[in-house]
């Protein structure tokens, strides 16, 4: 009997020490402790079943909510996106497995200039952003252009819902005629971009077999598990877009090629307000143009080039002026035409791609050409040198471009004269420096004046503009 009493006393004392008796019930001060960052010990509460039962009797609805409330691993799947009108909750009702993830698959364009193409995949849906080409390196003998490897798209063709194109530059649309032969799905983009794509498809007899869907800025399209919103941006071509890609896994913002230009030559400035609104919703990831990420400050406005042209036309008023630029830079062409008109010069256009772009932009209302300003290349010889401006391709030293053929004396209609002024209104794309230098040397040898500085501004954002977009979007 005495042994039983002693055992009971020892047990009671041990319970007191361990904190599971009397006033200290519910706390274990010896074992259940958390060490915080400042090295202080803090006791952790242990649930008391007696108090829990009383709480359940007094507040049955509160206890029921606590027990039945689900844990959402992906809250965006069960939310309504007000701007897109898309209810992602429907996808959860289809029995979508929690193991599914958003896949971002770059098929080109990373750590290189050109060949931009990225696939976004979720579940049974793939959306492809851009489909560009790049130009061959010096050691790629016999190669005219380089297109991306789309084997992954061909292997998953049943999932591919469409191409979404940010703007109409070759490094974003140039591979479409080749890729569409194996991956023929609809193409979604803005008006001018689709016009330029149509020109390329005509050359390959693919217009009838391709579905082209025009989208306006601010509009949202639904492609499988994705909803994609087009956002107005500025670039060295009009109708450029950024994309807000809504998926059950979250929002991805794809800037496309962009700059922040508050005084664009044509159209509105970049829609920074919309970037901020999307940022407040919560953005999973930001895919940003980084071409000029190593350049500090801001990119200058395209309008500043117009003033440079005015000064150059005034300085070289007595000579024939030939300007080489990118064919797709419609704003640059517009400023050249404006300056030529003010100085009483006629404008001739040379280079197949240049002629196609100017014709398309003019027909769609993106280029305003004063009456009786344009002349044919055959008519150049009928005008004095100080009354003519020639806009040509070849700013990148392409061997078969118009300016390169003029420099090599193999152009059929234009011969370089000692008094000519040649303006390079572009910067060499990395890798093209040698070819451009060769053309410049050949022009100098013929006695022409060559201007290759100060007549160009980039269409890509510098560091401060990238920081601005990042601060607005605030990706996770």
Cite the ranges covered by each PLM segment.
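Redox- and metal-dependent alpha/beta enzyme cores, enriched for Fe-S-associated oxidoreductases
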Residues: 412, 416, 426-447
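Proline-aspartate-enriched helix->loop->beta-strand connector
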Residues: 283-284, 318, 466-476
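A general structural motif
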Residues: 299-305, 392-408, 429-435, 455-464
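Conserved acidic residues
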Residues: 161, 284, 388, 420, ...
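His/Asp/Glu-rich metal-coordinating catalytic cores
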Residues: 90-164, 169-382, 403-415, 434-437
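Structural motif
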Residues: 325-327, 352, 392-396, 425-429
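Intrinsically disordered, low-complexity RNA-associated tracts
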Residues: 1-98
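Generic long, charged, amphipathic alpha-helical segments
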Residues: 443-468
